[in-house]
A protein has these predicted regions:
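C-terminal capping alpha-helices of c-type cytochrome domains
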Residues: 93-135
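Short cysteine/histidine-rich zinc-coordinating motifs and their immediately flanking basic loops
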Residues: 54-61
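Short Fe-S-cluster ligation motifs
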Residues: 69-101, 105
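Detector for the c-type heme attachment site
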Residues: 44-51, 69, 122
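N-terminal secretory signal peptides that target proteins for export/translocation
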Residues: 1-7
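Electrostatic cytochrome c docking/interface patches
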Residues: 22-37, 52-53
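Bacterial N-terminal signal peptides
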Residues: 11-20
Length: 135
C-alpha cells in the first residue's frame, strides 16, 4: 500500500516543525547559577550598600515578577536604576576585583544570567514550594 505524496510531505513538514520548535525553545534559567549569582553578587552588594540582605523569601512570586517587569532597581539615584544592568558584563567588570563570583561569571551571557536570577527568585519566593533566604 502506497501513501499518497501529500501525506508523506505533510508528515515530513510536521516532523521538521516539531524538531525545530524543540531546538529553539526559550531559555528558562539555571537555578544553580541563579542561586550562585544572587547569593554571591546581589546579596554582597545589598549587604554593603543597604547594610542588610534582601532574601528572595521576603517577597511573593508576583512581587518579584512586578519588580523585574518594572526594571527599577535603585530609586535613590545612587546607582544604576535598571535591574537588568546588574546582570550585565559591564557591571561584573566593575566588581570583578572584589567579587570572585563576578570574575568567574565575567563572560557569561547577560540574558541567560538575567533569566537565571529570575528563575531563582521565583523558585525561592515566599509563596513558592522552596522559600529561601540569602545564606
Amino acid at each position: 500500500m502506497r501513501l499518497p505524496v501529500y501525506r508523506v510531505v505533510r508528515f515530513s513538514l510536521f516532523s521538521v516543525l516539531v524538531t525545530t520548535s524543540l531546538a529553539v525553545s526559550a531559555y528558562e534559567g539555571d537555578l544553580k547559577r541563579g542561586r550562585l549569582y544572587f547569593r554571591q553578587i546581589c546579596t554582597a552588594c545589598h549587604q554593603t550598600v543597604l547594610g542588610k540582605p534582601i532574601p528572595p523569601n521576603e517577597r511573593l512570586k508576583a512581587d518579584w515578577v512586578g519588580y523585574i517587569k518594572a526594571d527599577k532597581h535603585d530609586k535613590t539615584g545612587k546607582s544604576n536604576p535598571s535591574v537588568k544592568y546588574f546582570t550585565t558584563k559591564a557591571y561584573r567588570e566593575t566588581i570583578k576585583g572584589s567579587n570572585k563570583a563576578a570574575e568567574k561569571l565575567l563572560n557569561a551571557n547577560d540574558a541567560e544570567l538575567y533569566a537565571d536570577v529570575q528563575a531563582w527568585l521565583q523558585y525561592s519566593a515566599k509563596d513558592s514550594d522552596n522559600p529561601s533566604g540569602c545564606q
